[in-house]
C-alpha cells in the first residue's frame, strides 16, 4: 500500500505548476503526483504535459481526456439551467472546477496522497471552488496553494527553475491571464483592471470581430429533453454540438462578454469572456422552453435557474441545495424537445423559428384569423373574477378617502 506522504498537484504544464512540483517537494518533503485534465482548452497534448511533469520531478503523472465527461455532465447541466451568472456570464470557469476537483480526489485516493495543491491566488474565486469541492468529496484531504500559502511568486519561480535546471522554456510572459475550456474563455489582464479601458483585438481568440462579420449563418438545432442532439439534421454529441457552435457562432462574433462582476470573495472585478457556443445554445434552449414549459412552471424555473447559477458560481456544485435544484430542473426538461432555427450574424444569435411536438403553443388558440378556437366571450367572466381583488381594494380606498385621483378634463 502506498504511503500517505504525497501531494496531488493540479498541473497545467506551464511555468507556475512545473516549478511547483519541485518547490512543493523541497518545502514539504513530500513526493508530488501531477494531475492534468483535457476539458477542451486546446494547446499541448496530454502526453507532452505528462512527460514534462515527470521531467520536472513528479513521481506520477495522471492525465485524463475529460472533454466528453465535461460536456455531458457539466456543460449540459449548465445548459438545462440556462446558467448565466448576473444575467450574462455562462460560468465558463466555475463549472470546470468541480470536475477537476473530482479527479484530483480520485488521484489522491489512487496514489496515497493526503494533500491536494492548486495554483490559485488568495484573491480569486477558484481557490474556494477547488477547496470546497474537494472537502465536499473527501473532507479528510488537506488543500494548499503554493502561491497563496508558500510565497511562490513569479520571480521566485524563475529563479528556482534556473537553480534546479528544470526543463522549462521561459518565454516572454503574456500580458493576459487566460482560463479556457470548450464552454468558453476567460481573459484577465492588467490594463483591463481599469474599467474605462476597452478590450483590444488581441484579447480575443474564440470570436472574430462582430463589426466585420461574414455572410449570416442559419443553423437548426434539435434538442431532446433539453440536450442538443442534431445540428442541421446531423447527429451530434454534446461535445460536438458545443464545438460546432463555438466555430460557427464564434465566426460571427457571438458571445463576447465584458462586465463588472461580483466575486465570491467579496470584491468587484472586471471580467472579459468569450463563450460563442454556450451563448448560442443557451439562447436556443431558452426559446424552446418558452414553447414547451407551462406558465407557472416556467416562472418558477426562471427563478431556479438564477439561483442555480449563483450557487455554482459560489462553489456549491456538490451542495445539497444544488442537488435539489438539479432534480427540479431535470424534471422540467422531459418535454423540452424540438427544433430551433437561428441566424448567427454580427455578434447576435437570433431565433427565427421553433417547432416541437410537445409545444404548448396552439395555433388555433393563438390566431386572430379564421379557424380561431378561442372563445373570446369567456374573457368577460375571467376578467370579473381576476379583477375582483382590485375592485374590493379600490372600494375600501374610496371609503377611507384614499382612492386614486383622476385629474379633471381641462380640454376646452
Swiss-Prot record:
Record: residues binding L-aspartate: 121, 125-126
Gene3D superfamilies per the UniProt record, alphabetical: Argininosuccinate synthetase, chain A, domain 2, HUPs, Single helix bin
Tagged with keyword ATP-binding: yes
Reaction equations catalysed: L-citrulline + L-aspartate + ATP = 2-(N(omega)-L-arginino)succinate + AMP + diphosphate + H(+)
Keywords carried by this UniProt record: Amino-acid biosynthesis, Arginine biosynthesis, ATP-binding, Cytoplasm, Ligase, Nucleotide-binding
First and last residue of the signal peptide: none
UniProt subcellular location: Cytoplasm
GO biological process: argininosuccinate metabolic process; L-arginine biosynthetic process; urea cycle
Annotated ATP binding sites: 10-18, 119
Entry GO MF terms: argininosuccinate synthase activity; ATP binding
Similarity section: Belongs to the argininosuccinate synthase family. Type 1 subfamily.
Protein name according to UniProt: Argininosuccinate synthase
Organism per entry: Bifidobacterium longum (strain DJO10A)
Source taxonomy: Bacteria, Bacillati, Actinomycetota, Actinomycetes, Bifidobacteriales
Amino acid at each position: 500500500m502506498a504511503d500517505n506522504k504525497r501531494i496531488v498537484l493540479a498541473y497545467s504544464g506551464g511555468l507556475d505548476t512545473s516549478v511547483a512540483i519541485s518547490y512543493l517537494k523541497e518545502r514539504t518533503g513530500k513526493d508530488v503526483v501531477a494531475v492534468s485534465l483535457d476539458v477542451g482548452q486546446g494547446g499541448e497534448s496530454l502526453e507532452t504535459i505528462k512527460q514534462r511533469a515527470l521531467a520536472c520531478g513528479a513521481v506520477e503523472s495522471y492525465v485524463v481526456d475529460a472533454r466528453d465527461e465535461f460536456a455531458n455532465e457539466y456543460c449540459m447541466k449548465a445548459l438545462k439551467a440556462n446558467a448565466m451568472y448576473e444575467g450574462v456570464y455562462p460560468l465558463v470557469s466555475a463549472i470546470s472546477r468541480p470536475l477537476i476537483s473530482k479527479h484530483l480526489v480520485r488521484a489522491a485516493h489512487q496514489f496515497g496522497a493526503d494533500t491536494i495543491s492548486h495554483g490559485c491566488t488568495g484573491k480569486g474565486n477558484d481557490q474556494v471552488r477547488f477547496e470546497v469541492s474537494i472537502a465536499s468529496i473527501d473532507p479528510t484531504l488537506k488543500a494548499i496553494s503554493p502561491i497563496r500559502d508558500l510565497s511562490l511568486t513569479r520571480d521566485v519561480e524563475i529563479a528556482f527553475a534556473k537553480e534546479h535546471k528544470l526543463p522549462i522554456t521561459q518565454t516572454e510572459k503574456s500580458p493576459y491571464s487566460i482560463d479556457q475550456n470548450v464552454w468558453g474563455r476567460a481573459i484577465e489582464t492588467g490594463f483591463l483592471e481599469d474599467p474605462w479601458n476597452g478590450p483590444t483585438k488581441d484579447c480575443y481568440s474564440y470570436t472574430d470581430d462582430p463589426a466585420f462579420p461574414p455572410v449570416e449563418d442559419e443553423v437548426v438545432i434539435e434538442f431532446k429533453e433539453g440536450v442538443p442532439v442534431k445540428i442541421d439534421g446531423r447527429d451530434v454529441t454534446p461535445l460536438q454540438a458545443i464545438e460546432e457552435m463555438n466555430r460557427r457562432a464564434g465566426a460571427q462574433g457571438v458571445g463576447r462578454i465584458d462586465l463588472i462582476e461580483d466575486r465570491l470573495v467579496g470584491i468587484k472585478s472586471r471580467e472579459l469572456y468569450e463563450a460563442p457556443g454556450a451563448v448560442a445554445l443557451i439562447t436556443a434552449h431558452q426559446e424552446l422552453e418558452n414553447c414547451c414549459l407551462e406558465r407557472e412552471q416556467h416562472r418558477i424555473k426562471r427563478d431556479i435557474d438564477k439561483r442555480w447559477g449563483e450557487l455554482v458560481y459560489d462553489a456549491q456544485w456538490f451542495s445539497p441545495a444544488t442537488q435539489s435544484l438539479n432534480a427540479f430542473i431535470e424534471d422540467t426538461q422531459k418535454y423540452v424537445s424540438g427544433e430551433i432555427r437561428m441566424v448567427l450574424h454580427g455578434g447576435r444569435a437570433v431565433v427565427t423559428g421553433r417547432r416541437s411536438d410537445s409545444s404548448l403553443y396552439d395555433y388555433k388558440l393563438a390566431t386572430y384569423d379564421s379557424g380561431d378556437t378561442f372563445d373570446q366571450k369567456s374573457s368577460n367572466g375571467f376578467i370579473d373574477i381576476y379583477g375582483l381583488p382590485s375592485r374590493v381594494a379600490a372600494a375600501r380606498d374610496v371609503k377611507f378617502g384614499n382612492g386614486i385621483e383622476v385629474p379633471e378634463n381641462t380640454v376646452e
